[in-house]
């Protein structure tokens, strides 16, 4: 709770600066050194990316928004750290994943890497494959927002909890010739090259290239990570148009590193042999067996263009493509290991999977700004379409035929009769979406009114992977309204209220459940929110109160079946308070963080069995505070504390304990033979705490051990 107190004491202090970047529909301005939208301290930006509405000042937005800058991404996104290590700097986000699974929650609702946007385009990342080093900003809008984000394109989760958008690095006005070496874990070495140039008489063309090479052992025993990647961003800007093309390839291979566990259950409750959550074991040990691995490669293309055609009017187009192949995924059945008693004994069959995904996306829209009397209008009309297909392993051998694992959390895990068969993929599902969005922001004096509506239809087919014949089909459609109101009594204060919604496609149950291939009804998520924002003197504080209602998909056990069922059984309500603070706290002191209080309850469950009980795996308290001391222009120290409260699982039968972790780092800038060099040292999980994170649902995620990271960056 110490982080909660620290963040609350910062509270409503002061704030500064202005903004302008992008998400869906409007392209970024060319980035220059010393961006005006970045708050003092450089850890966050004062801009708010609002989907098809383009770029908005955070004070003009009727939602909670956060933008993490490249400084924050680099500081907390170490080579061996999961993506969530960066994302949790937003107090609405909680980590529920590992390096094997880019899983996280926003306001208690699960998301994965596959629900991320890149330059406003959905479906370009995956649960396993989401490189953060390509991003100059990571932007968040908390809460469901189909009305401004358009169509989803994810085979695992929707963006019901909020929108997370990666903004790719672009060439700056100054040439970039950057080489960076890293060392982390036990023997993990990384090399990163970053080159940027602008060309043309007015520097209208820009090229930015980022490469990655990473290989070696992490801080976890027998946990190897290998990655190679190259990404190129080409942009063009003149008086009447802006264009951006991002393209790239990445290969990622991880040996070992299993951290996801479940508890054996019966009829939705733990079996009699489990009376408590076992204490977290040594996080530095590997809880897999030799041969367990995950390896994938993928390509992405993202194209954005906007063109002025009249005074105050422009049209825009966005398109994206992602191909990703998970070549190997050898792990325990259901992607985790099962704890069967209080002693921490393990029993699991193994499985081997292969997944091939393809995503296509296209959007066309028009935006106009005009007046009707004293009213100022900013109107956007956009239509989009998305296609998605997935192939999965025809036979995953999770019936025990490829072997099993046994052992104990505290004494070691071993394999029994293990062999690794050849895996062939077969068509698993195909999705198509069609959507249209209309929004108008009306401004009058100190007030703004947002009125928007999104209509979309989805067609989902599931297939027998062995025969590739259709086994299920569902068509769905929905209208999602969005409306909000902002009133600014003076230049420092902004009060807002809003309503927003999200509607998913109707999901195909994954192969880890007994009802694999079944299509669940589309789940609708609705949010009402109001809040206040304050900015002054280099500091921004934002407080929001929200109420979210979502159709509740839950895991259910039935007697006579070896695996659980995944069913839509009722409704969940998430009521909470979110506070965020960013900027310069005092001379030489910068701060970023906040807290979230979340009361998540189940409603309308089968036979009322679990009505009023906590949503499984959702912590009531969540807080983060990052504090930086800049002694001078060359030396700084940064620390971060993260607190996650207790979380109920198995319908309040068990409870995952709270935990508090700390990170600490230093940066020193100097010159070697006239070459600017930045030396950095970072320690993640400073106290080497062993703890469980409650996975959304009834799972447990084991922490990563204390990890040191050293780097040297040369600006040639």
Roles of regions detected by a PLM:
Residues 306-310, 314-320, 324-330, 495, ...:
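Membrane-embedded beta-barrel scaffold of Gram-negative outer-membrane proteins
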Residues 134-178, 203:
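A beta-strand signature from Gram-negative outer-membrane beta-barrel systems
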Residues 67-70, 84-89, 96-148:
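Periplasmic plug
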Residues 1-78, 84-90, 245, 362, ...:
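N-terminal Sec signal peptide and the immediately downstream disordered periplasmic leader
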Residues 357-359, 374-388, 427-550, 574, ...:
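Structural signature of Gram-negative outer-membrane beta-barrels, strongest in the C-terminal barrel
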Residues 646-648, 668-716:
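C-terminal beta-signal and adjacent terminal beta-strands/loops
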Residues 176-178, 182-259, 263, 291-307:
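Transmembrane beta-barrel wall of Gram-negative outer-membrane proteins
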Residues 446, 547, 567-651, 687, ...:
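Gram-negative outer-membrane beta-barrel transporters
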């Amino acid at each position: 709770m110490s982080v909660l107190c620290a963040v609350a004491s910062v509270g409503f202090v002061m704030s500064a600066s202005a903004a302008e970047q992008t998400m869906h529909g409007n392209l970024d301005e060319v980035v220059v050194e010393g961006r005006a939208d970045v708050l003092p301290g450089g850890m966050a930006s004062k801009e708010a990316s609002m989907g098809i509405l383009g770029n908005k000042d955070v004070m003009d937005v009727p939602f909670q928004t956060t933008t993490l800058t490249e400084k924050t991404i680099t500081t907390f996104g170490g080579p061996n750290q999961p993506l969530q290590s960066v994302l949790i700097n937003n107090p609405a986000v909680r980590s529920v994943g590992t390096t094997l699974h880019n899983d996280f929650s926003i306001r208690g609702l699960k998301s994965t890497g596959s629900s991320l946007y890149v330059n406003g385009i959905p479906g370009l990342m995956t649960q396993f494959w989401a490189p953060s080093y390509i991003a100059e900003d990571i932007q968040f809008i908390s809460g469901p927002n189909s009305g401004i984000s358009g169509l989803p394109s994810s085979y695992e989760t929707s963006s019901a909890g909020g929108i997370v958008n990666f903004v790719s690095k672009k060439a700056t006005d100054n040439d970039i010739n950057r080489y960076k070496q890293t060392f982390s874990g036990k023997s993990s070495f990384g090399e990163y090259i970053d080159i940027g140039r602008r060309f043309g008489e007015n520097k209208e063309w820009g090229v930015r290239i980022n490469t990655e090479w990473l290989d070696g052992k992490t801080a976890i025993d027998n946990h190897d990570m290998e990655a190679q990647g190259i990404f190129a961003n080409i942009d063009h800007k003149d008086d009447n148009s802006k264009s951006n093309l991002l393209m790239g390839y990445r290969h990622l291979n991880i040996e070992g590193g299993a951290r996801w566990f479940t508890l054996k259950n019966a009829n939705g409750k733990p079996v009699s042999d489990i009376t408590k959550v076992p204490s977290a074991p040594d996080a530095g040990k590997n809880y897999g067996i030799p041969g367990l691995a995950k390896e994938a490669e993928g390509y992405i293309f993202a194209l954005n263009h906007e063109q002025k055609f009249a005074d105050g009017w422009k049209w825009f187009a966005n398109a994206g493509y992602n191909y990703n192949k998970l070549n190997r995924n050898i792990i325990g059945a259901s992607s985790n290991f099962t704890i069967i008693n209080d002693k921490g004994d393990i029993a699991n069959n193994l499985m081997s999977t292969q997944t091939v995904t393809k995503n296509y996306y296209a959007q066309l829209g028009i935006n106009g700004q005009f007046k009707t009397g004293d009213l100022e209008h900013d109107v956007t009309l956009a239509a989009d379409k998305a296609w998605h297909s997935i192939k999965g392993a025809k036979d995953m051998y999770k019936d025990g035929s490829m072997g099993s694992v046994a052992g104990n959390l505290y004494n070691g895990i071993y394999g029994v009769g293990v062999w690794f068969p050849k895996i062939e993929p077969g068509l698993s599902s195909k999705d198509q979406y069609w959507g249209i969005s209309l929004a108008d922001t009306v401004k009058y004096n100190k007030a703004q009114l947002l009125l928007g509506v999104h209509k979309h239809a989805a067609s989902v087919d599931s297939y027998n992977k062995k025969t590739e014949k259709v086994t299920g089909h569902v068509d769905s459609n929905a209208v999602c309204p969005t409306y909000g109101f902002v009133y600014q009594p003076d230049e420092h204060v902004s009060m807002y209220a809003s309503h927003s919604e999200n509607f998913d496609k109707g999901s195909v149950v994954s192969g880890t459940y007994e009802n694999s291939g079944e299509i669940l009804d589309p789940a609708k998520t609705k949010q009402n929110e109001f809040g206040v924002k304050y900015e002054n003197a280099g500091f921004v504080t934002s407080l929001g109160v929200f109420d979210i209602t979502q159709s509740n998909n839950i895991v259910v056990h039935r007697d006579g079946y070896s695996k659980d069922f995944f069913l839509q059984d009722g409704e969940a309500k998430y009521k909470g308070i979110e506070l965020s603070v960013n900027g310069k706290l005092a001379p030489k002191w910068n701060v970023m963080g906040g807290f979230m209080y979340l009361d998540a309850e189940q409603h309308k469950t089968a036979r009322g069995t679990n009505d009023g009980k906590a949503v499984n795996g959702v912590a009531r308290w969540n807080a983060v505070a990052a504090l930086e001391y800049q002694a001078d222009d060359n030396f700084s120290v940064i620390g971060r504390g993260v607190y996650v409260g207790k979380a109920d699982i198995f319908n309040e039968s068990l409870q995952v304990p709270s935990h508090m972790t700390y990170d600490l780092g230093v940066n020193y800038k100097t010159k070697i033979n006239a070459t600017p060099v930045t030396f950095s040292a970072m320690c993640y999980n400073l106290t080497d705490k062993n703890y469980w994170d409650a996975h959304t649902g009834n799972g447990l995620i084991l922490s990563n051990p204390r990890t040191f990271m050293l780097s040297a960056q040369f600006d040639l």
